[in-house]
């Protein structure tokens, strides 16, 4: 295989990524400043060189469960190092940044109602066998990216379908209830569902516009210039600073308010996996950059009793209470005393409302202990 990929932005050739003498080299082939591949890699004559795969490209690589499945099936036939994986996945990578390919991937779409109401015990395994190679999404949780028909809208749209293993019981329900808290706190979230058998959490991609063109999306690993192995290295203060650096003036206040609420909820719900890859920015051009919707929120302490926050806050990885969280909002999110107090109260009310919603699941005797445990973790 040739060790290069032609990179496109909004379907136009932007540059070439190559791997030469153990170095990754990206060279722009355009002079149009709008065709930048990353907010941190503007168009320029000089190439962008790196010993590791550039974080923007690495963002497209699978991790954990998906990575193990792909390596198991394809390591006999092709290299499965970072560049080999990117080449393998590139035909299915759709977004503002994509790759020129001769091969066109066509897969029969699924129907949303069928996923939500299926009684097939092996459904997720079947989804993996069909969609694993077409799922350029990061994260260690078992998940695939699938095209699904929504009968309500009659549209074919991309959804992320997540499942869970025996070591993380009821993870789909956990994430669903946590995301309901986020939604109740008036934070922008993607469309999401829980299947009737609670085996699947299904979330719509949030970087696709109504006209089926794509928004740019970059997670904080990309914006920090870090590789995925460093996603637990950093602070929430640094994320706030990055928001202030990159977000457009007209969206800055709203983005900082939402980020503050995200942090409050992650602490209230004891989400120890709110790392750099679980926050990001979206944009359609350089003048319209804002905080991405919230995603991947779970109560990790249900499974890891003594889990701690993913990143440092106020110099420590501990579950700070109201006083310290309000201080964070004032000092680093540029909010007033009145604003942080009101936003914090909104998050607490959202959590309390969803606790009442969660209690409905206690009618199922198999869920009663799990729900009690989950609610007990929510401070």
Model feature map: region roles:
Residues 1-272, 276, 280-379:
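Phosphate/dinucleotide-binding and metal-coordinating scaffold of catalytic cores
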């Amino acid at each position: 295989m040739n060790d290069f990929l032609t990179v496109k932005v909004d379907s136009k050739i932007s540059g070439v990524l190559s791997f030469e003498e153990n170095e990754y080299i990206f060279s722009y082939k355009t002079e149009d400043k709008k065709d930048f591949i990353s907010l941190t890699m503007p168009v320029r004559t000089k190439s962008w060189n790196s010993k590791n795969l550039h974080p923007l490209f690495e963002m497209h690589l699978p991790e954990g469960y998906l990575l193990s499945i792909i390596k198991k099936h394809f390591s006999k036939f092709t290299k499965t190092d970072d560049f080999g994986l990117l080449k393998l996945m590139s035909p299915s990578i759709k977004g503002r940044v994509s790759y020129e390919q001769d091969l066109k991937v066509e897969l029969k779409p699924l129907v949303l109602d069928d996923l939500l109401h299926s009684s097939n015990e092996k459904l997720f395994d079947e989804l993996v066998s069909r969609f694993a190679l077409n799922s350029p999404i990061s994260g260690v949780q078992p998940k695939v990216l699938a095209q699904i028909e929504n009968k309500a809208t009659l549209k074919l749209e991309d959804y992320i379908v997540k499942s869970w293993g025996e070591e993380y019981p009821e993870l789909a329900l956990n994430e669903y209830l946590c995301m309901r808290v986020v939604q109740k706190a008036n934070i922008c979230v993607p469309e999401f569902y829980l299947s009737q058998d609670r085996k699947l959490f299904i979330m719509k991609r949030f970087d696709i516009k109504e006209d089926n063109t794509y928004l740019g999306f970059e997670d904080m690993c990309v914006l920090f210039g870090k590789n995925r192995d460093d996603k637990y290295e950093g602070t929430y203060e640094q994320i706030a600073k990055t928001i202030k650096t990159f977000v457009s003036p007209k969206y800055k206040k709203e983005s900082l308010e939402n980020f503050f609420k995200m942090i409050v909820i992650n602490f209230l719900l004891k989400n120890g996996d709110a790392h750099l890859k679980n926050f990001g920015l979206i944009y359609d051009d350089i003048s319209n950059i804002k905080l991405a919707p919230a995603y991947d929120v779970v109560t990790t302490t249900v499974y890891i009793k003594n889990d701690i926050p993913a990143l440092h806050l106020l110099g420590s990885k501990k579950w700070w209470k109201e006083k310290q969280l309000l201080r964070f909002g004032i000092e680093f999110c540029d909010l007033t005393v009145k604003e942080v107090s009101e936003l914090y109260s909104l998050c607490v009310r959202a959590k309390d409302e969803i606790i009442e919603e969660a209690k409905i699941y206690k009618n199922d005797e198999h869920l009663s202990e799990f729900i009690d445990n989950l609610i007990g973790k929510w401070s």
